[in-house]
């Protein structure tokens, strides 16, 4: 049984969408049980419509919900210990749940997750990993906005964590990893990126295969299983891809409404165009994973519908079932053990 704690008040639509999303996830995975955190008056009427879900869940009434516009520091001060967001994360810390899922304010969620769960040993900064649609299926891109900037060692840690996530999600034995750069040549790019490339080449890690530098146009090609970058560049790439998907959708809509014949053709092809737009948009592959914490936290897109919420829950389900954090901890331990200088008589 995989136990999932769910912030029912997160996102643009709160329990009206989050609860039906949980019901969809339960239909697909009967071995899920839920721990819900919400505001009773708003959640009870919706939950009553899903008796099967109510049976497989425990509901905790909370004092407040974090708004989508609150600053992380304000949310932490106001909502620590008593908000739906905090308590859903705390359930992972206490062992009541295996994974926490929220569609709430990203900054507040990261601040609370870091404060409540703390980072793993040898991890200076957590990262947000996005599942990215590609021509070959899906890949993982991290960091897409947890922190701005990263040194070579932090990029190295991101590579290890991303590789572990790829093994848990895609079930590949040795995922390929690339560093996002302005060119594939070794002499190009910022010093920290070049140094991270050197570290990855020399580390010879058996849990991943370093494929060198990749460029922005490789993101959609699926050139590698994992693309590593720092949060500023990663977030720009994510928002650019989301915007491009919407732009293409608008172009198609405009082109197909210019004449009566085009409008008739659009009606017949609408589902295909919608599928194209969704394929291009990383936000539709819902469920950003916070990596590097002592517990699994999944961030759903705030504007997700019930299907999107279900997808985020399923990402959390897969991560917990396939032992994501154990894989990360093992990989970090092996790598950092190699870096330690020899001790005892052998060192002399």
Curated annotation (Swiss-Prot):
The keyword Cytoplasm applies. This is Phosphate acyltransferase. GO terms for cellular component: cytoplasm. Pathway: Lipid metabolism; phospholipid metabolism. It is an enzyme of class 2 (transferase). Its EC number is 2.3.1.274. Homodimer. Probably interacts with PlsY. GO terms for molecular function: phosphate:acyl-[acyl carrier protein] acyltransferase activity. It is found in: Cytoplasm. It comes from the Bacteria. It catalyses: a fatty acyl-[ACP] + phosphate = an acyl phosphate + holo-[ACP]. Keywords: Cytoplasm, Lipid biosynthesis, Lipid metabolism, Phospholipid biosynthesis, Phospholipid metabolism, Transferase. The lineage of its organism: Bacteria, Pseudomonadati, Pseudomonadota, Alphaproteobacteria, Hyphomicrobiales. The keyword Transferase applies. Coiled coil: none annotated. Belongs to the PlsX family. PANTHER family: FATTY ACID/PHOSPHOLIPID SYNTHESIS PROTEIN PLSX, PHOSPHATE ACYLTRANSFERASE. It comes from Rhizobium leguminosarum bv. trifolii (strain WSM2304). GO terms for biological process: fatty acid biosynthetic process; phospholipid biosynthetic process. Catalyzes the reversible formation of acyl-phosphate (acyl-PO(4)) from acyl-[acyl-carrier-protein] (acyl-ACP). This enzyme utilizes acyl-ACP as fatty acyl donor, but not acyl-CoA. The gene is plsX. Its main location: cytoplasm. HAMAP family: PlsX.
